[in-house]
């Protein structure tokens, strides 16, 4: 078992997910300095000024998710919410990696990698055939992302859908999370980050039960 590699990954992944969550929160006017009010709002939409000074217009469910995020920050603090988000998504990434390597996923389709060795995860190339209970709106969203070459957006959307489906069969492992957690997630299989680190730097044998592989995540503090 590559304990050193696993330890280094766990430490770096935590930092990356924490920073990413903070950046995502900033897109909704939520920072360690407070939660801003919308600079504009109307029927079904709100506009927030981001940390970078740009404007972010949100609609529908994202409005209620943002409201829940603000409530959580006010209740337990900004740092604690970011830590919770990082910890939650880290655990799910590890669980899904373990399941896909051992072919334990109900869909039998890899989520973070490809059985062919391609950099593009199988869930992105085979989403039409994968049973994730995607409705027409879901399919349209994924198709639009791919059409616009926003492959990471399609990947992240499908990853979240997979987590929700796994909650049905593994409710203890994939407990229902606060919906605002989705606002704090930003994943990429194309660029360097947690997914590439997990797939490229931790040998599959460390996850494969047939090779007596078992992951011990060290340094998650």
Predicted regions and their residues:
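Preference for the N-terminal adenyl/adenosyl cofactor-binding alpha/beta module
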Residues: 1-221
